[in-house]
Amino acid sequence: MGLTKQYLRYVASAVFGVIGSQKGNIVFVTLRGEKGRYVAVPACEHVFIWDLRKGEKILILQGLKQEVTCLCPSPDGLHLAVGYEDGSIRIFSLLSGEGNVTFNGHKAAITTLKYDQLGGRLASGSKDTDIIVWDVINESGLYRLKGHKDAITQALFLREKNLLVTSGKDTMVKWWDLDTQHCFKTMVGHRTEVWGLVLLSEEKRLITGASDSELRVWDIAYLQEIEDPEEPDPKKIKGSSPGIQDTLEAEDGAFETDEAPEDRILSCRKAGSIMREGRDRVVNLAVDKTGRILACHGTDSVLELFCILSKKEIQKKMDKKMKKARKKAKLHSSKGEEEDPEVNVEMSLQDEIQRVTNIKTSAKIKSFDLIHSPHGELKAVFLLQNNLVELYSLNPSLPTPQPVRTSRITIGGHRSDVRTLSFSSDNIAVLSAAADSIKIWNRSTLQCIRTMTCEYALCSFFVPGDRQVVIGTKTGKLQLYDLASGNLLETIDAHDGALWSMSLSPDQRGFVTGGADKSVKFWDFELVKDENSTQKRLSVKQTRTLQLDEDVLCVSYSPNQKLLAVSLLDCTVKIFYVDTLKFFLSLYGHKLPVICMDISHDGALIATGSADRNVKIWGLDFGDCHKSLFAHDDSVMYLQFVPKSHLFFTAGKDHKIKQWDADKFEHIQTLEGHHQEIWCLAVSPSGDYVVSSSHDKSLRLWERTREPLILEEEREMEREAEYEESVAKEDQPAVPGETQGDSYFTGKKTIETVKAAERIMEAIELYREETAKMKEHKAICKAAGKEVPLPSNPILMAYGSISPSAYVLEIFKGIKSSELEESLLVLPFSYVPDILKLFNEFIQLGSDVELICRCLFFLLRIHFGQITSNQMLVPVIEKLRETTISKVSQVRDVIGFNMAGLDYLKRECEAKSEVMFFADATSHLEEKKRKRKKREKLILTLT
C-alpha cells in the first residue's frame, strides 16, 4: 500500500541575526598566534568567533541543542571549554573547530569554568550547587565537591598550591584541599550572595564582590610561610610604628597558638573594603593576567577599573608619605610644640589599590574580558545587553587614562527583538524589523545588505516589485522605504493607536491595515511627483475606512479578494465582504483574543491562532469550526499557510514552531531550536523556506528538504527523544561504599552511557556464545577424529577475525573515557564475573594495563560486597592481585625510565646551549631574588 499523502521534512538551515547571547560570557581567544584580535561569544547553542578588527564572523563552534552559558579558553590558547544549559561541557579545538571531548556530570546549567595553570584540570561550577574537577588529558572526571547550598558563581585554582577556592549564591566562600577533596575552610563574612572573587598579590589577597557596593578584601596567610623564619612579614613597612609591629606579632602568635582546625592550611583576615561607585550588585569581577588591573561592573553600563600597585610603587608612596609626615612634624616643632620621638605612617588599603578610571558603554554590560597588548595598552571587550560587542582600549600607566572605543560589531543583528518578518517575491531577500531598525538580509549568504532606521515596527511587507517596503508602527504610522537608496520616502499617520496588522490585496494594487483605534483602513498604491526629482515615486492613499466596536488585532484578505477577515479584541473573527463592507460571518469560540490568522490559497479554509493556546480551523463558506487543535503550551503568536497547500505553520511562546495539516488535522512536525519566545515567522512564496525570530535575538532559517516525512516515524522519534530526556533526569544509582559527603562520583547517567553499557553486555554475550561454540567444536572434532572447519562470526570477521576476548577489549577501548565509570555503574552484576576473568587475561598479556586497571578498580569498589562473598571469584581475585602488581610495576618502571631519559636529554641540551630554557629555572631565580629583597628590607626596618 502506497503512502496516502507525502509530507516533506523541514530542517534547520542557519542561525543569524545574533551577535552574542546574554546567558554566557565573552572571552578573548588566541587564533593564528594573534592575541587581542579575536573574541568568542555565545550565540544561542553555538559559539561565534568574531574578528574585532574586521567585524567579521570567522568561525562557528557548532553546538547541539542546549544554550551556551559559560566559556573558558585554555591556558595554551588552543582549546575553548564551553558549558551548556543542561550541565554538559564540551572542549573545542580552536584550530579545527571540532568538539571532541564531552563531560556530563552536572544536572543544571554551568555557571563557571576555570582551568588550572597548566591546563590539565578543569573546574566546573553549576546551578546544581556542585563543583566537579575534570581531568582534561584523560577526558574523565576526577571528583565532585559538594558543600554549597546554592548556585556556584566562581571557582579558582591556586597556582602554587593544590587548592581551589569557590563562591556561591549561598553567601559562602569555600576553600577546598584537592589532595583530600574536602572543604577545610568556609568564609562566612558575607551577608548576601557572593557574585565573584579574584586572587591578587601572588595569591596572598582575595577580593570578593557581593550584592552591595563594597568589594571586600581579605589577606591570606599560608601556615607554612608563617612558620618559615626566613620569610619576613610583608606587612612590616619601613617607617611603621612599633605598635603596629606588636599587633602583627600578636596576630602571628595567634596563628601558631590559637590555631583553629580550619586555619591549618591557611588563614583569612579581612583587610578592608574598596567602595564601588555602582550601588547595585556586582555582576562580574575579574583581574587581567598580569594581576595589576582589577575590573568590576554591576547591572548598569559602567566598568570600574582599579590598579593594584607593586611593592616598589607602594614603597615609593610610603616614602613620600613619610617625607610629608616628617615635614609636618618639623613644622609643629618649630611652632614650639613637642616633637614626636618617631613619625608613624600607616599603609591603608587605598594606598595599595587605586581607582584608575571608568569605562562607560553604550548599553548595559552583560560580561567583559581584559587583555594587555604588547605595547602596554589595556583592551576591554564587552558583550552588551542589546546584542552588541564593543572594544575599548586605554593606557593604564598614564596619570588620567582615557578609554577609547576602537571597535564595534553591530551590523550582524538588531538591538532589540525582531517583531516582523517578510520574504520578497523571489524568495531571495528577507526583511526583519525591530524597535529601531529595518534590516534586509540575503537569504543565501545570510549577510545584512541594508539597514534603515525606523520607529517601533509591528508589521511589514514588500511592495510588489520588491523595490520598496512598507512598515506599520506602534504609534500607528505607515512608513514607506526605498530599498535601493535606503531612504524613508514617506511617513503617513494611518491610525491613532498601534498599527497591528497589514494585508496586501491579491490584485497587488493596495493593502488593508488594522489598528488599535477600532478601524480597518483600505489603501491604494499611487505614483506621485517627487519634489527632489523629475521622476515620480511611489506613495499610498487611503480609499475607505471600516469602523468597528473593538480594537483590531489582525486582518487578512481572501485570495479571491471577495472577503476580509478581521480579528477583534472581543475574541471573535468577523468576515466582511470587501466590495460593500457588509458583515458576512462571525467566528467565535476562542477564550482569548485571536492574535494571528491566515486564509488558505483556495479560500476554503481560515486558521486562527489565539492567546488561549488553541488553533481553530474554520470553513469560509458557512463559518463552521472544522477542528480545534491544542497547538502550543503558551500563546500562539504567528500562523501562516504554506503557499498552494492546506499545510500551515504556527509559532508559539513555548519556543516551538509546528507544522499542521488543515485537511487531516494532523500535527506533522515540530521545529525546535529557539530558546525563548518566538514572535513571528514568514513562509517564502515558494514554500521552500521558513524564517523565524525570537526573544533570544536570533533569526533562524528552516529549509524544505526532499526527504519524505512519515508521521508514525516522526511520533516514534518524539517518543525516543522523551525517553532520552527522562533517562538524564533519573536519580543517580547509589554506589556502595561511597559517602554522600564532600567528594562524590562525577558521572551522570545519559543515553550515551546506557548505550555504552549495552555494548559491553552485547560483547560479553558474544564472548559467552563463542566460548561455548569453541567447546562444542572441540568435542565435534574429537568425536570425528579430524579437524572440522570452525563457523566464523560475522562481527568478529568485521574486526579482522579477532578472538572473542580481543573483541571485548576493543569494545572497552571504544568507550569514551568520560563515560567509562558511568557505563560500568549501570552494568548488571551477572556480567561482572566474566569481565573479571577477561581482565585477568588482558593484564597477563600486558594489553592496555592502565585502562583495564581503571575499570577493574572501579568494579571492585562498587561490587565489593558481592565479589568478596562469592567463593567462585576468590581464585580470580587472587590471580588478579598477583598479575596487577607485577604488570603495574612494569608500566611504572617504563614511565620512570622514560622520565629519566627525558631529564638526561634536557641536561644535554642545556649543556650544549648553556641556556636554562625551561620555565621552572627562571621562576626559581625570581623566587630567590624576591626572598633576598625581603631580607634586605627587613634589615633596613630593624636598623
Curated annotation (Swiss-Prot):
GO terms for cellular component: nuclear membrane; nucleolus; nucleoplasm; Pwp2p-containing subcomplex of 90S preribosome; small-subunit processome. GO terms for molecular function: RNA binding; snoRNA binding. Residues 326-345 are annotated as: Disordered. It is found in: Nucleus, Nucleolus. Keywords: Isopeptide bond, Nucleus, Phosphoprotein, Repeat, Ubl conjugation, WD repeat. The modification Phosphoserine is found at residues 240-241, 726. GO terms for biological process: maturation of SSU-rRNA; ribosomal small subunit biogenesis. Pfam families: Beta-prop_WDR3_1st, Beta-prop_WDR3_2nd, Utp12. There is a cross-link at residues 474, 529 (Glycyl lysine isopeptide (Lys-Gly) (interchain with G-Cter in SUMO2)). Part of the small subunit (SSU) processome, first precursor of the small eukaryotic ribosomal subunit. During the assembly of the SSU processome in the nucleolus, many ribosome biogenesis factors, an RNA chaperone and ribosomal proteins associate with the nascent pre-rRNA and work in concert to generate RNA folding, modifications, rearrangements and cleavage as well as targeted degradation of pre-ribosomal RNA by the RNA exosome. This is WD repeat-containing protein 3. It comes from Homo sapiens (Human). The gene is WDR3.
